[in-house]
Amino acid sequence: MAHKKAGGSSRNGRDSESKRLGVKKFGGEAVIAGNIIVRQRGTKWHAGANVGLGKDHTIFALTAGNVDFRTKANGRVYVSVMPKAEAAE
């Protein structure tokens, strides 16, 4: 009897799509209003001045300027947008 036993089916072989999280605009980079600065799950980075926080914790620019990352005394990293200085008249 030259028979083979039935092979077992694999229960692995799946993976989820990557979510492309992380910093999209780094410190010192120029942004305009609406630009996404950070995509994250939870608040690894916190919203500072001139940025908004989306319902999925995305941090985005509210004004044009340069991105600034600051660590405060409480250990939290705050992301802000420093507006560009207006030309003196």
From Swiss-Prot:
Map out region (Disordered) in residue numbers.
1-21
Give the signal peptide range.
none
Q: Where are the transmembrane segments?
A: none
Q: Which GO terms describe its cellular component?
A: cytosolic large ribosomal subunit
Molecular function (Gene Ontology), one example: structural constituent of ribosome
Q: Which UniProt keywords apply?
A: Ribonucleoprotein, Ribosomal protein
Question: Mind telling me which PROSITE patterns this protein's record contains?
Answer: RIBOSOMAL_L27
Q: SUPFAM superfamilies this protein is in?
A: Ribosomal L27 protein-like
Q: Which GO terms describe its biological process?
A: translation
UniProt family annotation: Belongs to the bacterial ribosomal protein bL27 family.
Q: Which PANTHER family match?
A: LARGE RIBOSOMAL SUBUNIT PROTEIN BL27M (PTHR15893:SF0), RIBOSOMAL PROTEIN L27 (PTHR15893)
Tell me the protein's name.
Answer: Large ribosomal subunit protein bL27
The species is Sinorhizobium fredii (strain NBRC 101917 / NGR234)
Which gene produces this protein? rpmA
